[in-house]
């Protein structure tokens, strides 16, 4: 969805702000790590009747496919409540998106070193940040042995702290950085990737020029 946000005047990242705030600290960390981060006004959710589940509905005010390392800070508004990184080569990361906490626990049990990885807690699961791997495709339901696990690489986004939004039941969701380092994509999980071609995730709209 493409909407223009006019509720508040833009407050850009390089303007005078409270540098002690958690919002500033997390954004500064993402920028220092070279992530191609940007913001958009807010995120809603809606109930998908066909899939029988609640889904995110990001209200973009930027055609994010046009965001680059050179211009992404121009699209970082501190008045916004929704934030994302362009994954893949632009940010130097390939993200494992586990949308089920039980599956994440099982994955950690089978791959204990994952506890050392840069990890973000989401509403239903976790994002595990790995060093960019050009041989891995963006895909949904990506692993053979783990359910509800997607790969966010080139031509994809990963919502990130300090992103927050409200569910239909009124619960407030806040993305939280848990710590860790950005390490090489685990070989055990790379070997577990499904090899057949799958369509890209339809969770995000990719705008054409």
What is the predicted function of each stretch?
Residues 1-209:
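Conserved phosphate/metal-binding and DNA-contacting active-site motifs used
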């Amino acid at each position: 969805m493409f909407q223009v946000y006019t509720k508040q005047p833009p407050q850009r990242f390089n303007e005078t702000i409270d540098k002690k705030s958690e919002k500033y600290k997390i954004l500064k960390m993402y920028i220092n790590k070279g992530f191609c981060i940007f913001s958009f006004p807010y995120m809603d959710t809606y109930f998908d009747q066909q899939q029988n589940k609640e889904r995110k509905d990001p209200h973009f005010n930027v055609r994010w496919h046009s965001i680059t390392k050179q211009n992404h800070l121009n699209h970082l508004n501190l008045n916004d409540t929704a934030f994302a990184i362009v994954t893949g080569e632009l940010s130097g990361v390939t993200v494992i998106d586990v949308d089920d906490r039980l599956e994440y626990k099982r994955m950690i049990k089978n791959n204990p070193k994952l506890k050392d990885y840069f990890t973000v807690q989401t509403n239903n699961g976790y994002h595990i940040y790995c060093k960019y791997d050009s041989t891995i495709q963006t895909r949904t339901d990506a692993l053979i042995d783990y359910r509800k696990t997607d790969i966010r690489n080139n031509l994809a986004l990963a919502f990130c702290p300090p992103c927050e939004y409200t569910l239909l039941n009124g619960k407030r969701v806040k993305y939280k950085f848990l710590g860790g380092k950005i390490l090489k994509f685990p070989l055990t999980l790379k070997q577990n990737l499904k090899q057949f071609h799958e369509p890209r995730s339809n969770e995000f709209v990719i705008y054409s020029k």
